[in-house]
From Swiss-Prot:
Transmembrane segments: none annotated. It catalyses: Fe-coproporphyrin III + 2 H(+) = coproporphyrin III + Fe(2+). This is Coproporphyrin III ferrochelatase. Fe-coproporphyrin III binds at residues 13, 30, 46-47, 54, 125. One of its GO terms (biological process) is heme biosynthetic process. Belongs to the ferrochelatase family. It comes from Anoxybacillus flavithermus (strain DSM 21510 / WK1). Its EC number is 4.99.1.9. The keyword 4Fe-4S does not apply. GO terms for cellular component: cytoplasm. The keyword Cytoplasm applies. InterPro entries: Ferrochelatase (IPR001015), Ferrochelatase_AS (IPR019772), Ferrochelatase_C (IPR033644), Ferrochelatase_N (IPR033659). It is found in: Cytoplasm. Pfam families: Ferrochelatase (PF00762).
């Protein structure tokens, strides 16, 4: 019996592939407004500080390929064909949907490489994909909305946190705090009833419980440079505040809203947060990001299959 063929649309933010892409990439993020020379110079400096253009593009591609491989390995009913769609650079989400349509894919499942739902992120990715599919007359698309509660995802982070705490001296362990963070979004999402902040808190609760950590908080990072208020506290301010109020001597940063090594982690955490801990004379720890770790890829595969089972697929 031949297997059913299904498109696997993996969506992510996207990143410049080379330095020449910086301007058009950030122009797209800024809805067509070109970044100033100062902004571009600042961005170049940040990328240089992390060793050149972020590794995100290669990691995202690897995550998507490994996910398709894993899905085809663990079940025999469906043959998944992977299509990668990015938010701010080619292949855009629409390009991927168009490619599926041209390849004769009639049904597809989408997943965004971001664990939490928000109107600004996951909703906009899935909205763009559905809109393009409707415009073309196919494929029929079912979308994963969030996956932060997946036990295997929580286990990935809990295992890394346990390893990190095990590497500390006893004194550090007793005086350590875990900061679980995600990308800040404009504060107005709270008034809109967006579940994003609550989902980050739940993620932190799950990870801390599984890792056996009692001292933990959530923080926000990488806020945009706009006049409107963004979700806080920012992780750098939070680090100073926790040090002053509680006297912690070791800070463990888990940027659980992200899934790979990229500018927001390699610069905003590993450089900016570390500058703060160095200034305070305390220890900085940041467990490895999921990237294409088999444990994380298996978590994503489980999310996709569980979603399809709920949609009535016989798997």
């Amino acid at each position: 019996m031949s297997k059913k063929v299904m498109g696997l649309l993996v969506m992510a933010y996207g990143t410049p592939y080379k330095e020449e892409d910086l301007e058009r990439y950030y122009t797209h993020i800024r809805h067509g407004r070109k970044p100033s020379e100062e902004m571009l110079a600042d961005l170049r400096e940040r990328y240089e500080a992390i060793g050149g253009i972020s590794p995100l593009a290669a990691i995202t591609k690897q995550q998507a390929e490994k996910l398709a491989e894993r899905l085809n390995e663990v079940q025999d009913e469906i043959e998944f064909r992977m299509y990668l769609g990015l938010k701010h650079i080619e292949p855009f989400v629409e390009d991927a949907v168009q490619q599926m349509h041209e390849d004769g894919i009639e049904e597809a499942v989408s997943i965004v490489l971001a664990p939490h739902f928000s109107t600004f992120s996951v909703k906009s990715y899935n909205g763009r994909a559905k809109e393009e599919a409707a415009r073309l007359g196919g494929p029929k698309l079912t979308c994963v909305e969030s996956w932060y509660t997946e036990p295997k995802f929580i286990q990935y982070w809990a295992d890394r946190v346990k390893e990190t705490y095990a590497s500390m001296s006893e004194r550090e362990r007793e005086k350590a705090v875990l900061i679980v963070s995600a990308h800040s979004l404009p504060e107005k999402i709270i008034a809109m009833g967006d579940p994003y902040p609550k989902q980050l808190q739940e993620t932190a609760d799950f990870i801390a419980k599984e890792a056996g950590v009692s001292e933990y908080v959530i923080g926000w990072q990488s806020a945009g440079n706009t006049p409107e208020p963004w979700l806080g506290p920012d992780v750098q301010d939070l680090t100073r505040q926790l040090y002053e109020e509680k006297g912690y001597e070791a800070f463990v940063y888990v940027p659980a809203g992200f899934v790979s090594d990229h500018l927001e982690v390699l610069y905003d955490n590993d450089i900016e947060c570390k500058q703060v801990t160095d200034e305070l004379g305390v220890s900085y720890y940041r467990p490895p990001m999921p990237n294409a770790h088999p444990q994380f890829i298996d978590a994503l595969a489980t999310v996709v299959l569980n979603h399809l089972r709920k949609e009535g697929e016989s798997l």
